[in-house]
Structure formats: C-alpha cells, structure tokens
C-alpha cells in the first residue's frame, strides 16, 4: 500500500462581500477538511476614524460615527455624546434619557435581527432571513418617523436628543412591541429545536469562562460563557436601573449558547421598551445650557440683516483638560471611547474600543481543529461588523 503524503493546502476565504461578513479575509491552512491554522487579514475598511475625530468638533463628528457599526448606529452616537457629557458634567433631562433608552433598545433589536438572518443563511436556513427583514423594516419605520433617517440617524445631541418624539409615535411603538414578541417566539419554534440546526451549532466554538475573560470578550460572547456581565447593570447609565429586566446568559459557551443569549436579549429589550414607553416623563428633550452657540456675524444682504439659519457655527463647546473612558453595552459587546481633552473644541485623542475587533481576536483559536464548514458557523456566532473592526 502506497502512503500518500499530503501537503497542507492554503485557501484564502474572502474578502467577503460587504453585505455578508464585511470585507474580512481569512487565510486558512487546511489538512483535507480539517483547519490547521487561520489568519484573519483586517484593514480593508480602515478609514482613519480616530484621526478624523481629532480635527472635528463633537457635533461635526457625529455624522461620522454612525459609519462604525452601521447596523446599530444609535450606540455609536450615544457613546459620542456621552463622552463629552461626562467630561464636562452636563446633565441630561429625564425625558431625553428615556428617549435615548428606547432608541438604543430598538437599535439593539434591529442589530440582533440582522445578525440572526445571515447567521441562519450561513448554516443553510434561508427562510429566517426574509422573516427578520420584515420585522426590521418596522423598526426602521419607527426610526424614520422619529429621526427622519432609517439608518444613519444623527439623532443624539450633547445634553439630549435632536427632536422630541412625534405625536402618536409612542402608540405606534407599543403596537410594534405587541406584534414583535410573538414573532420572536415563532423564530424560536422554527429554529431552536431544529435537529439540523442543532447539529451545526451545538458544541461548535466553545469558549470557557476563564478564557472569555482573559481574551477580553464582551457582550453576548462573554455572557454565553457563563459570565453575568452587562454594562447596563454595571455602569448604571441612562435610566436602566428604574426598569425591571434581567441579564441574559448561558453557561455552555458554544455557538448555540450565543444564539440563545441574543434571542433572549431581543425579548428583554422589548420588555425594557414597553416599560420605558409607559413611564416616560414629560419635560424638555435637551439640556439647553449645552447649546453654547458662538454667535456668528450676520451677513448683510441687500443692505438688510439676513442670516442663513443653516450656517450657524457648530457649538464651540470646549473640552476641559481631562481624560475619561466611557462605555456602553452595544449589541456586539462593550463599545468604549477614551477621550482626552486639551481645552480646545477638538478632542486631543479619541480612542475607540470596538467590541467586534476584540471579539474577533479569538477566531483563529476557535477554528483550529474544526472542519472547514464550521468556520462560517463560528464567524457568524461572533457577530462582527467590519466598519467597526477596521475603523
């Protein structure tokens, strides 16, 4: 019998299309169908977001931040206004805080929905993809009614939000919550006990509790490994403490556990939204003191005073000479910003801590020794957005 000597084969997976897992390239070393090594190549979507922040005022920078994680844009906006608010100690009115909380949780549901669809499509189940688009469209309709934009909302402002909720919006949102909860249960009936689905995800990509902490994982990746850590409970930001909700977690640490955590989070988010809508207080939707506008010189037009309203300068809002790290619980994990001010209107340093980038580091270790087909399952369960990974 002749022994055949096989050399390991090196395959380049990607760069994928932006609509799938973003422009991520994996250089995979294969022995037959077993993965020996995997090296992620990043940087195809690098746009220098941290450097751009250093020569923009906070308000000028707001439209840029929605391009990090472009499926959960409310969170990037929240962190961008929270950082200077904490640095300069600006109080946010209660109504504004509630509006922010509702928007953040709607954004979380939309993000998890758009994780679930492609994840199931990767495994081979095409149907849920069309279901989730139907529900996600409704969330985007709510966003459009409140902010004017479906995706890049540009809604948060320093000291509050841009505009109040329109008349009838709260009822529409409550209707959506009543419609959506049975739909999540329908997803669970379709997916969770499906034998083919379970074969593809059970025991695939296991991360232990210690390992998850040592790798610095956060979000559903960490909570699926048995760590009950949610920044909404830990950091007590906005008004989450006033509502009744539970941290979703699992102890198995495999791809199935990560799926279950995200499904549970969608239900909890709807619970939070319902409570917030029912107990939203009145009052102002922004802190007017935060709008320290520099009065622009009025331009003369045909000898009478005429001011272009839209040409008012950005708020010349000085960041004091301090440094501060602020974080929020984004759908993918801990999204943080380390901000250093130096007494000017521009930040001196704006360091972004993206959850996707740090969660992705564990991928090579998870896929070693697995089959080639399991790479997509594991990559899908991590939930990355390359705009945020590459910045």
UniProtKB/Swiss-Prot annotation:
Its main location: plastid. Disulfide bonds: none annotated. It catalyses: a plastoquinone + NADH + (n+1) H(+)(in) = a plastoquinol + NAD(+) + n H(+)(out); a plastoquinone + NADPH + (n+1) H(+)(in) = a plastoquinol + NADP(+) + n H(+)(out). GO terms for biological process: photosynthesis, light reaction. Its EC number is 7.1.1.-. Coiled coil: none annotated. Belongs to the complex I 49 kDa subunit family. This is NAD(P)H-quinone oxidoreductase subunit H, chloroplastic.
